[in-house]
Amino acid sequence: MRFITGCLLFMSVFLSGCLKKDIGCPYKIENIIAPASEEQAILAYLSANSLTATKHGSNMYYEVLQPGTGNVPGLCSGIVINYAGTLTNGNTFDSQTGAIFTLGSLIEGWKLGIPLIKKGGRIRLYIPPTLGYGSENVKDQTGAIIIPANSILIFDITLTDVK
């Protein structure tokens, strides 16, 4: 009987080590670098519009309009933002006030760009297609294309809260 009890105890301890552990934050940065052709398209847009922006290592460009003073969000942070997204032709494809997201669940350009500011900060991101929606058309509820494939995305984002 002691042998069976000992075996059961051993097996329960052994198998408990196989249980799924809390993996922490499931999100990660993909370390994607946009191709030079996409970077050149952004540079051409910036030049044509007399804009100055800082290059990120991913070949995205950004302007910190207000750095903020609060917390910097991590990938698993809940963020509250006001934003407007436009195309290089000036068409606004989306805007929201008080939008709530988990940073890590968003497009790569946002995962890389939003942590460049703190709570209360404002940033403008010039996101190449590779860090945005890539070669896919984005459609609205009616099926109309609101973001054509391979579009550069321009986002004006204010980080109002980090949770």
Regions found by a protein language model. Name each.
Residues 18-163:
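Cross-family detector of peptidyl-prolyl cis-trans isomerase
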Residues 1-18:
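Sec-dependent bacterial lipoprotein signal peptides
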